[in-house]
Amino acid sequence: MTARRTRIKFCGLTSAAEVALAVEAGADAIGVIVADSPRRVTLDEAAGIALAVPPFMAKLGVVVDPPADLAVRLRSFGFTLQFSGDEPARVCETLAHGSAYVKAFHVDGAAEDASFERIEAYTHATPMFDTRVDGKAGGTGIPFLWRIVESIAKRRAVIVSGGLTPGNVGACVRALRPYAVDVRSGIETSGRKDIDKMRAFVRAVRDADAET
């Protein structure tokens, strides 16, 4: 019996050198942030990073309520769009231009948020669940209660983000069996990508996969 394989995305990459680290560690996808963030990159930088991503590795452009021209440019570089703001379904569907994309939904309570009921409206999206703390959505470094999205994860492919680290991602994979996991600060030391943490993160996911 073949073990399932959880996809792994390393987010917040800022250079071709960090892409090389992600490849070495065994990530399936990388993300660049073209929105307000300490790890924000310009469009020109995103284009350069895209050229460093090898074939068969996915690349995502993270945006927040983006203008149409930004979405068009990112798609022209080969990025799959990841909408991490309050974008309604019609906007995401229009800007993705019929292509698959990722839509972030933010978790800040002890039960499924009402916004989860609207997931089906995002026809071409894979939903990603991330943490919201004190009004800050994403980039908190704090995990949410995974049981909140357990029922959704049983029904469809989901991506889990928010406070994942080499120390807890295995438990997340065992609990939810998500399609993918997404990590940013959990593979960093002093704000920079750490190859040892990147390898440990991948190893923890693969160990959990093997227990299926």
Where does each model-flagged region fall?
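Conserved N-terminal beta1-alpha1 strand-loop-helix module at the mouth
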Residues: 1-212
